[in-house]
Curated annotation (Swiss-Prot):
Its EC number is 2.7.1.4. InterPro entries: ATPase_NBD, Carb_Metab_Reg_Kinase/Isom, ROK, ROK_cs. The keyword Chaperone does not apply. This is Putative fructokinase. ATP binds at residues 130, 182, 230-234. It holds the Pfam family ROK. The lineage of its organism: Bacteria, Bacillati, Bacillota, Bacilli, Bacillales. The gene is gmuE. PROSITE patterns: ROK. Induction: Up-regulated by konjac glucomannan and by cellobiose and mannobiose, the possible degradation products of glucomannan. Repressed by glucose via the carbon catabolite repression system. Also repressed by GmuR.
Length: 299
């Protein structure tokens, strides 16, 4: 049996399940200070006989396995969690193999193995909510360089009629600064869920998302793009994305996915809100396999 932790800035989801993505049991609770939160995590998992645990965490995180601080949450504004040794703490408490990555990487893994990208060798999972993040899988592996991708902070072309300055405290009018949930609320004076019947809101949102997707397509050329997160619960935004992506690409890449079949290419997650927690079970299984391969697996 495997354990998974989807650690978000507002809530934690913990689950136990199997390597095939089956969830057997799960629990949710608010994200508090680290000691209080991790105590609840350990109490929950102590009920089960687990072989390994996977963590998909809010970030930024140190996701470099060669780093001395691998598995640490780094420059987060979340109170108490800055420089928190998440991976090592769980490992010390549970004394079993622990896999680690970002929450959006976990969601990408879930959709890659069991959801919309099953059977493909590449995909891009983007979450648009309180922030904007992405996990990319290329040739069957999560993309990792100096850091995990920070695709929410690319610059996009501002709509000529949009005078909003942007919400990102680092970059102002980057993708996250213009299209995240807090940006929508700041621009229009209401939360996204309360603006569902105002077409202007979602056309502008679709325009900005399409700007970003065009860049990702040109750079990564993923075989499937999956859009999740709270903002994407407003399904009407997809029609504007489907309208703007081909216009922006302007037939530069001649693939049917970008024209006739675009609604099969840019999709919501098949696993819904379970994509991330299922992905953490994948991370747990990978950690178990890695330890077995190194000859250190416990009997």
């Amino acid at each position: 049996m495997l354990g998974g932790i989807e650690a978000g800035g507002t809530k934690f989801v913990c689950a136990v399940g199997r390597e095939d993505g089956t969830i057997i049991d799960r629990i949710e609770f608010p994200t508090k200070m680290p000691d209080e939160t991790i105590e609840k995590v350990i109490q929950y998992f102590s009920q089960f006989s687990l072989q390994a645990i996977g963590i998909g965490s809010f970030g930024p995180v140190d996701n470099d396995k060669t780093s001395q601080t691998y598995g640490t949450i780094t420059a987060t504004p979340k109170a108490g969690w800055r420089h928190y040794p998440f991976l090592q703490t769980v490992k010390n408490e549970m004394k079993i193999p622990v896999g680690f990555s970002t929450d959006v990487n976990a969601a990408a893994l879930g959709e890659f193995l069991f959801g919309e990208a099953k059977g493909l060798d590449s995909c891009l999972y983007i979450t648009i909510g309180t922030g904007i993040g992405a996990g990319a899988i290329v040739e069957g592996r999560l993309l990792q360089g100096l850091s995990h991708p920070e695709m929410g902070h690319i610059y996009i072309r501002r709509h000529p009629d949009d005078v909003y300055q942007g919400k990102c405290p680092y970059h102002g009018d980057c993708f996250e600064g213009l299209a995240s949930g807090p940006a929508i609320e700041a621009r229009w004076g209401k939360k996204a869920a309360d603006l569902s019947d105002i077409a202007q809101v979602w056309e502008l949102e679709g325009y900005y998302i399409a700007q970003a997707l065009a860049q990702y397509i040109l750079i990564l050329a993923p075989k499937k793009i999956i859009l999740g997160g709270g903002v994407m619960q407003q399904k009407q935004v997809f029609s504007y994305i489907y309208q703007y992506v081909p216009k922006i690409m302007n037939s530069y890449l001649d693939f049917s996915e970008l024209s006739d079949d675009i609604s099969d290419y840019i999709v919501p997650p098949r696993l819904g809100s379970n994509a991330g927690i299922i992905g953490t079970l994948v991370l747990a299984h990978q950690a178990l396999q890695a330890e077995a391969a190194s000859g250190e697996v416990r009997s």
